[in-house]
Design a protein with these regions (language model features):
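Short loop/turn segments that connect beta-strands within beta-propeller blades
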Residues: 70-74, 115-120, 163-167, 207-211, ...
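Short glycine/acidic-enriched loop and turn motifs that connect beta-strands
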Residues: 54-58, 110, 156-157, 200-202, ...
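WD40 beta-propeller blade core
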Residues: 67, 112-113, 160, 204, ...
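Beta-rich, blade/repeat-based domains predominating
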Residues: 33-45, 56, 61, 84-101, ...
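A short beta-strand motif characteristic of beta-propeller blades
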Residues: 27-30, 75-87, 120-132, 168-174, ...
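Blade-level signature of beta-propeller repeat domains, shared across WD40, Kelch, NHL, RCC1
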Residues: 268-318
Length: 330
């Protein structure tokens, strides 16, 4: 289990409860993030990137920027990539994905590509569903590890497929059941696309052919999720999702157990998992901040620290308490 924890904070008091993290002796604070949306790492775990909308999420104001951190979580450049500077166009950067040394960024109706080492623009991919490109509003992008990027359009209930290196864009699926697809991830083992729903708090699986299956949804008597923003997986196949409105980060284990690993968070956004270093990366949009924390390493033995269960949140009835020793049964 990692003992490294790096916190970026611009708020004075935030109630944070990381149930699976270890307190760390070192902290680094950055107070100049502006509406951070997404937080990702390179595959090697040596570079980290945070997208900053810096204003209205749908406005073409060319003032968005990307923050870069080094392997130790220290600031390399607050505005490593900045809209309006050095021939860069970047309006409201949201979700990101790294393909080798190329950083792809969802920016309104365009997928922009930058060199991850220099920050220089290398490609611009216009995304259109056949209607006016300006109607497209991309929220996230995910890479399948081979040659395909997937992009979500939350407002249109649509997911796009982008082929590399040809940059051919097609609509993978448009379906109301997606209910505002915000965050995307590709399952590291199955290769299926996972989308989380902003409108109805659903988690969905989409095949490479575009077939949609609901994995988790709120029931009539229980509502686990409200407005889901981010999703990613650790190296063991556990899924992590952020609930923007309730301020919680959930873990769904491979055997479908639900665990709240953090709560009372200020607007947790499009989270990422650094699988190399076993870290969780969470941006806080309204707090203009972001945080890195170590994740618990799965173990065959039971942890000495009692973890919270679904019973604590009313999702399943708690097991009956055993009778006191020596009690007389009637």
């Amino acid at each position: 289990m990692h003992c490294r924890s790096v916190r970026y904070a611009s708020w004075s008091a935030a109630a944070l409860l990381w149930l699976a993290a270890i307190p760390a002796p070192a902290q680094i604070t950055v107070t100049e993030l502006q509406t951070p949306y997404s937080f990702i790492s390179s595959q090697s775990g040596k570079d980290y990137f945070i997208s900053n909308v810096n204003g209205e999420p749908d406005q073409a104001d060319n003032n968005g920027f990307i923050t870069k951190l080094d392997a130790n979580g220290k600031l390399v450049s607050l505005k490593f990539i900045e809209g309006g500077k050095s021939d860069v166009t970047l309006h409201a950067p949201k979700g990101m994905a790294l393909v080798e040394q190329t950083l792809y960024v969802a920016d309104l109706d365009t997928l922009r590509a930058f060199d991850a080492a220099s920050g220089k623009p290398v490609a611009t991919i216009a995304v259109s569903s056949g209607s006016a490109p300006s109607s497209v509003r991309l929220t996230d992008v995910a890479f399948d590890g081979k040659s395909i990027l997937y992009c979500s359009d939350q407002k249109a209930n649509r997911i796009y497929r982008v082929e590399l290196p040809s940059q051919k864009v097609t609509v993978l699926v448009t379906d109301p059941v997606l209910a505002g697809p915000a965050g995307l991830a590709v399952h590291p083992k199955s290769g299926q696309v996972i989308a989380v729903s902003w409108d109805k708090g659903k988690i969905l699986e989409i095949t490479p052919e575009g077939a949609v299956t609901e994995l988790f949804s709120n029931g009539f008597f229980s509502s686990r999720f409200t407005n889901l923003r981010g999703v990613d997986f650790d190296r063991w196949g556990n899924m992590y999702v952020s609930d923007f409105t309730t301020g919680k980060v959930w873990r769904m284990t491979w055997d479908k157990r639900f665990q709240v690993i953090a709560e009372y968070l200020p607007s947790p956004g499009d989270l990422g998992i650094d699988r190399t270093n076993n870290l969780i990366l969470v941006p806080y949009e309204y707090a203009h901040a972001a945080e890195m924390n170590g994740l618990e390493t799965p173990s065959g033995s039971r942890s000495k620290q009692e973890k919270r269960t679904l019973a604590d949140y009313g999702f399943i009835p708690p097991p009956p308490k055993p009778p006191a020793e020596g009690a007389v049964k009637k």
